[in-house]
């Protein structure tokens, strides 16, 4: 089994999620050295898979011989025809549709993103506020894509935030299966139920086969 995976992100929330999901498998999770000073990859893909794969390939060149995993994730709201989608990280940016492509890890404020979703869902009844979190992980080594892994979590978008444990859209995303928002989950619960946890389990299965 591959015992070490480097995660291409400077987002501490994502690193916590990965570490929590990997702990039961005995997999060491690390960040890329000096990642914060690395120029961001331009995310110009039309799908989560496109963006995750591109990031993994480019960032894996920074750590020769290592398995590097990058993710692209976001929220799809059915009443908004799948938005924010691949634009989730910067949905509140005023120039969202005026400047393409955009750079990874230059996210606008989470609260502003949430506020835009709430504004666009104003008046939408609860039964039509369905949506899902999507996470795609891409693994690469030495600039070559190895595989991708998709995880999803179905839920309901609330009309006000709840909880303080999460990041991004977590406070708005209500998960009926356990009666909590993702921002109310413990690290263990999030590893079990989240879209990122689902994708990571597929990654772990791939590691086991390797």
Set out the residue ranges of the language-model regions.
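Anionic-ligand binding patches
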Residues: 2-6, 12-210
């Amino acid at each position: 089994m591959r015992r070490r995976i480097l995660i291409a992100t400077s987002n501490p929330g994502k690193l916590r999620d990965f570490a929590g999901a990997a702990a039961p498998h005995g997999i060491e999770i690390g960040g890329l050295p000096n990642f914060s000073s690395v120029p961001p990859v331009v995310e110009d893909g039309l799908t989560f898979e496109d963006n995750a794969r591109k990031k993994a390939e480019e960032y894996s060149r920074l750590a020769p011989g290592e398995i590097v995993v990058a993710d692209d994730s976001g929220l799809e709201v059915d009443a908004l025809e799948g938005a924010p989608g691949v634009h989730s990280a910067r949905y509140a940016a005023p120039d969202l549709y005026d400047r393409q492509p955009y750079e990874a890890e230059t996210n606008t404020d989470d609260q502003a993103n949430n506020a835009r979703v709430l504004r666009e869902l104003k008046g939408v009844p609860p039964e039509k506020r369905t949506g899902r979190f999507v996470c795609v992980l891409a693994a690469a080594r030495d600039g070559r894509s190895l595989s991708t892994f998709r995880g999803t979590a179905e839920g309901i978008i609330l009309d006000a935030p709840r909880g303080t444990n999460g990041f991004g859209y977590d406070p708005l995303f209500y998960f009926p299966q356990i009666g909590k928002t993702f921002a109310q989950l413990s690290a263990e619960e999030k590893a079990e139920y989240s879209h990122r946890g689902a994708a990571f389990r597929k990654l772990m299965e791939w590691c086991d086969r390797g």
